[in-house]
Amino acid sequence: IQRTEDRVTRPRLRQPDGSYKEISYDEAIDWTARMLVKSRKTLMFGWINTSCQAMSAGHAIAEKVGGIVDNGATVCHGPSLIAIEDVGITTCTLGEVKNRADCIIFWGCNPAHVHPRHMSRYSIFPRGFFTKEGAKGRKIFCIDCRYTDTARCSDIFIRIEQGCDYEFLDAIRTVLHGGSLTQKSIAGVPADQIGKLAEDLKRAKFGVIFLGMGLSQTVGRNHNIDMAINLTYDLNRFTKFVVMPMRVQGNVTGSGEVLGWQYGFPFAVDLSRGDQARHQTGETTAIDLLLRGEVEASLFVAADPAATFPIEATISASKHPIVTIDPHINCTTEISDLHIPVAVDGVETGGCAYRMDTIPLEMRKVVDPPEGVLTDVELLKKIEKRVDELLAQK
């Protein structure tokens, strides 16, 4: 595992001619610490493919240098987290879905590609305690603006117009409240089909709505999620219904959990006042900071923002020092001034990670990392120690 000849096992520092030179870990730690101490506003983004212990170690550094900590939720389910803060959530674990759910709705998501084990382990095919017939005992709905492979696995596919999720959700809620639809079609769906959908949902014994980025990253954003959560509240007047965001990208759920219990906010946390955390969507989110040109240095940990951020944000980040901590070579490491490789979490080192239903799982080490390669926790603690030494000299 991960023993290819081209794997990077030593830190690489970019030279004036654009090439990379291998340096020692001590030199890399000193370079990173000096960058963090010198910068007046440091963006510490990522925390996706790493353990909760590493996140906590990174947050300790951010408090001391006044950095801003953000994670992958800012480009995926950040709006879902905002909606949950606004209206709460009725949810469950994936184990309950497997054992109880007889009605599954995939809304704006495509787990056949993004979560390839989701349907076979939890949502469609498994036989649970109260769902002994497996897929035959479940009714599967797919609601999306395009026909996907998940739609092929569904019993009923409802195609809605792009950007009209809010209106469609509102129409279902109207029917559930006993109202009548005055338009012949809403979001491209006939009114009688919306009424039939509402009746199907009411007849379920236990239903679950899985919300994807097609709902959180389209027109309406957090208001779409607000409406979906309120739909489950309405359905609970008739039967048992829950909702769950389809979180992606490794341990991004864990990052939100750790930030939440440490500072009270799940992403985009401004620690420029030390442990007095602040959060404001659009102000302290990574992309907005970069687009406004406020960031003086970037520390990217266990993520590849250069592959997912808008090109303008990536260009803005590249104008200032960048350190990337990641076991792999990716788009971000190639624009970084310093790339520090670490052990692969969940393979070469253990730690805690959160499943998409916020269940913590202990990752177990499988093999040893290459000789001399530090874990991310060890590296971050050494950076913190060096930061303390530099701050003491000021």
Describe every region a protein language model picked out.
Residues I1-V175, G188, M213, E294, ...:
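N-terminal export/assembly segments and adjacent metallocofactor-ligating motifs
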Residues M44, I104, I209, S298, ...:
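Receiver (REC) domain switch-region micro-motif
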Residues A54-S56, H115-R117, R152, V219-R221, ...:
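Short glycine-/acidic-enriched loop or helix-start segments at secondary-structure transitions
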Residues A62-F125, T131, I229-E334, A343-E348:
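Extended redox/cofactor-interaction regions of prokaryotic respiratory oxidoreductases
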Residues A83-I89, I172-H177, G256-Y263, L338, ...:
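Short, surface-exposed amphipathic charged segments that create phosphate/polyanion-binding patches used
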Residues D144-R146, T150-T182, M213, R221-A228, ...:
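Short alpha-helices
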Residues L338, D357-K394:
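Long, C-terminal catalytic modules of enzymes
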